[in-house]
């Protein structure tokens, strides 16, 4: 437990962002020409997108891109790089008959097929230790915010909030309270787009 409270790492989310900071991040993404992803609003911060001064060639459109995706993409062909535009438009998923999130690894409670389509075909995924899982709340999929441990959850002031979740039993709640970002048990933070509640997923290496 002491280790969890006293050690951090490069994944850390140090504190909640102010509205001004959120606006600056939106402006930076707009300057870079990044599309807006409802279910993954800060893909550069979470590491879903990487940046390269030299650029790489998008496998889908064949154009050089300085921002690219190398995360999970479930398709028959082995895809190395995808640009943000080909993900946002759905072209990458169409061209390769692929998806960025397994549609069997999602919370129940979302009945709108358009929302499912947006999540699995037009939203960059995230990399977990095991099979990535996407949380839902208020009849919609949540926004993915990044990797966290107990230290980050305390800094954000949401530790008690994420523990208030029928998903977790008492033993699992204790594990979350002692989790270390980047450790053997990894937590992934989500936020409801409608009521703002924070939710977790966790897995083991």
Model-derived features: positions:
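Preference for intrinsically disordered or flexible, low-complexity segments
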Residues: 7-205
């Amino acid at each position: 437990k002491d280790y969890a409270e006293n050690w951090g790492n490069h994944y850390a989310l140090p504190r909640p962002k102010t509205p001004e900071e959120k606006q600056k991040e939106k402006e930076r993404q707009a300057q870079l020409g990044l599309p807006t992803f409802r279910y993954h609003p800060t893909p550069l911060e979470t590491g879903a997108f990487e940046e390269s001064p030299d650029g790489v060639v998008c496998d889908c459109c064949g154009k050089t891109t300085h921002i690219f995706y190398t995360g999970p993409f479930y398709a028959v062909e082995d895809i190395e790089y995808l640009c943000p535009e080909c993900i946002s438009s759905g072209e990458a998923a169409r061209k390769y008959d692929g998806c960025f999130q397994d549609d069997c690894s999602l919370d129940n409670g979302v009945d709108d097929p358009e929302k499912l389509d947006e999540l699995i075909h037009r939203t960059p995924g995230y990399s977990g230790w095991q099979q990535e899982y996407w949380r839902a709340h208020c009849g919609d999929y949540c926004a993915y915010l990044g990797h966290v441990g107990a230290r980050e959850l305390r800094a954000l002031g949401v530790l008690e909030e994420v523990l208030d979740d029928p998903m977790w039993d008492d033993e699992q709640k204790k594990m979350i309270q002692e989790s270390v970002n980047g450790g053997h048990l990894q937590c992934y933070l989500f936020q409801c787009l409608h009521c703002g509640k924070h939710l977790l997923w966790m897995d083991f290496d």
